[in-house]
Amino acid sequence: MPVHAFSQPKGRLEFFQTDAHALLDNLLGDPTARTVGVYVPQACREGERYPLLIDLAGFTGSGLSHLAWKGFGETVPQRIDRLMMQGHLAPAVYVFPDCFTSLGGNQYVDSIAMGHWARWLHEVLVPGVEARYPVITEPGGRGLFGKSSGGYGALHQALHHGEHWGAVACHSGDMDFELCYGREFPEVLLALTQSGLSISGYIERLHRRRRIGGGEMHVLMTFAMAASYDPDPDAPFGVRLPVDLQTCERDDGRWAAWQSFDPIVGLERIAAQENLRGLKGLFLDCGLRDQYHLLYGARKFSARCEALNIEHEFETFDDTHSGIDYRMDRSLPWLVDKLA
């Protein structure tokens, strides 16, 4: 049984708001004003500047949820304090943005349906933190980390906007879309029979209910991926699927739009390769029993990086996709060491 963390964080935990209507305007009706949590450890001294690390939450999560009490576990600030007390982690400033959406989560890409979250991260969030906190203001002092959708978002930034970052850690991030998403479409269509194959009807029905079941959350997650990777500006909530709703036959054009966001595909771009080479560090890991089959994409991505002579750290561990926050014990010291 894990040991419960009873001690409260010893540093400063503060909050501020950003509002970037032009970037985060969306088809979901979600607010463009967002709350950002910031943790400044007690060891940070006045007059000095420290690495900036941004925590991108996984699907169904928010940076704010990483600050909340957890039974038989640690909040991320508690984890930071413990690692620092053990001498494993140097001081840095940590940022926890609320990027949750009405479709259940965020892939942190630019989408007319969900909002331009990729740009928001480096055009709005970073300057907002730099104006308020003692962080290194050069790209080489900034890092991103996340798990699952958050890991995907961190890697997406590295591939497409690497000039803004010094190091990135991706825990069990979405990649090889055929393996991790392809199997979901038949199940989604079965679920849609409850609403006469109406995507908007299904979403509206969920919004009227008091709770969402696990299977329904997976359907909503597929809708969120569709709104992220191939949004339809004329559809309710911006959602269209890359399959025929009657036969589940794949629409090659629509699926190609999805695949253009796959890190396996994105890595073939020369600009993406140069972005990764420009980083101080790239950390990837995945569980050997990941139930979403993300291990195979991670292995492919790492192997391709090796073939392209792109330096990176790739690790596997004996676990699933779930309950793996302990992997931050490995990635956070690694990131801060690269950025300091």
Report the location of each language-model feature.
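Non-catalytic cap/lid and distal C-terminal segments of serine-dependent acyl enzymes
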Residues: 1-340
